[in-house]
């Protein structure tokens, strides 16, 4: 067995953990916090030109005020379809059509809804932690295979410590992101 077979690809492990963090940030971005953000519209697709098209590909999305999102739809014939897609999306915002522009006034969240969103954020964070732990498990499995292929005990310990350090760092980043998101959600 060659020396390369006994190496553990820490970069691949790091990339997979970073992917879990990116997915978490995307999920957090879709949570409506009472503050305007273009990211709340990312999951919305519009039936345009015979296919489901992401809303951000049909017009420009701006946030001119803290509680207002403005969509300038490029094809004026799509305004009613965009409005319907927003209404049907379940994000809890009623679009207001103002000529060629669609305005989305973001209502304030009540305390009960804030707590509910905080729990949803915690659920997303737990999913990210599970994904990171699964990556850790895969890394540890690589180390076990390398050990059975002749890796020295000291090398096994070193690689295990490296994988654990990456895991601890990624879990800490998830916890920090969750804390920040919950603070943002609970802020009145």
From Swiss-Prot:
It comes from the Bacteria. It comes from Cereibacter sphaeroides (strain ATCC 17029 / ATH 2.4.9) (Rhodobacter sphaeroides). The keyword Cytoplasm applies. InterPro entries: Ribosome_recyc_fac, Ribosome_recyc_fac_dom, RRF_sf. NCBIfam families: frr. Keywords: Cytoplasm, Protein biosynthesis. One of its GO terms (cellular component) is cytosol. This is Ribosome-recycling factor. Pfam families: RRF. It is found in: Cytoplasm. GO terms for molecular function: ribosomal large subunit binding. Responsible for the release of ribosomes from messenger RNA at the termination of protein biosynthesis. May increase the efficiency of translation by recycling ribosomes from one round of translation to another. GO terms for biological process: cytoplasmic translational termination. Its main location: cytoplasm. Belongs to the RRF family.
């Amino acid at each position: 067995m060659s020396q390369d077979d006994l190496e553990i690809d820490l970069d691949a492990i790091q990339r997979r953990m970073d992917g879990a963090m990116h997915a978490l940030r995307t999920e957090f971005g879709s949570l409506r916090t009472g503050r305007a953000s273009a990211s709340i519209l990312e999951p919305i697709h519009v039936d345009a030109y015979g296919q489901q098209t992401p809303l951000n590909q049909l017009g420009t999305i701006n946030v001119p005020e803290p509680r207002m999102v403005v969509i300038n739809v490029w094809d004026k014939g799509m305004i009613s379809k965009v409005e319907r897609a927003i209404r049907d999306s379940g994000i809890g915002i009623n679009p207001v059509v103002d000529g060629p522009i669609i305005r989305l006034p973001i209502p304030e969240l009540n305390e009960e809804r804030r707590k509910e969103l905080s729990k949803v954020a915690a659920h997303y964070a737990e999913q990210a932690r599970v994904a990171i732990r699964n990556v850790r498990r895969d890394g540890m499995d690589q180390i076990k295979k390398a050990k059975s292929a002749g890796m020295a005990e000291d090398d096994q310990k070193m690689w295990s410590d490296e994988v654990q350090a990456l895991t601890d760092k990624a879990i800490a980043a998830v916890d920090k992101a969750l804390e920040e998101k919950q603070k943002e959600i609970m802020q009145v």
